[in-house]
Amino acid sequence: MSSQIRQNYSTDVEAAVNSLVNLYLQASYTYLSLGFYFDRDDVALEGVSHFFRELAEEKREGYERLLKMQNQRGGRALFQDIKKPAEDEWGKTPDAMKAAMALEKKLNQALLDLHALGSARTDPHLCDFLETHFLDEEVKLIKKMGDHLTNLHRLGGPEAGLGEYLFERLTLKHD
């Protein structure tokens, strides 16, 4: 059934939004996995766990915001299967942070692609929505993760348990 409120909202934009929702669901699921991995008794890095669980919550808010916009524009949300996280054992903090950075770059590229599609379809509402709620936050998060990776390497690299502990205590407790 077609929406009575749909106006200037192309079907390819609608499909791209549904794909982005799926990517955000997958990211939230991955960050939840990361968060609870670092909460395990044999890993026990509370600050790292908290950092990733906060990201899971932010991604949840992101996909809900996208779904709400989809409904407001007269689009239809089509849910897809969510892929299992790539790992069950995430290793040390630098490995997990690198995986998270790759995920954020993938999300950022998907947002940029959707913005370009919105521009090509002359959809200023979509472009403004993405600029207001997503694009700037993604860039800030990628920068923050890059800073965290730099500090982790300064503290002794991926094999330095004390460096990982100090990073967790001194950096992530202040976020």
Curated annotation (Swiss-Prot):
Q: Which gene encodes it?
A: FTL
Q: Which disease is it linked to?
A: Hyperferritinemia with or without cataract: An autosomal dominant disease characterized by elevated level of ferritin in serum and tissues, and early-onset bilateral cataract. Cataracts may be subclinical in some patients. Neurodegeneration with brain iron accumulation 3: A neurodegenerative disorder associated with iron accumulation in the brain, primarily in the basal ganglia. It is characterized by a variety of neurological signs including parkinsonism, ataxia, corticospinal signs, mild non-progressive cognitive deficit and episodic psychosis. It is linked with decreased serum ferritin levels.
Keyword Repeat among record annotations: no
Q: Which InterPro entries match?
A: Ferritin, Ferritin-like, Ferritin-like_diiron, Ferritin-like_SF, Ferritin_CS, Ferritin_DPS_dom
Query: Where mainly located?
Result: cytoplasm
Give me the ranges of the annotated region Catalytic site for iron oxidation: 54-61
- Give start and end of each Ferritin-like diiron domain: 7-156
Identification of the protein by name: Ferritin light chain
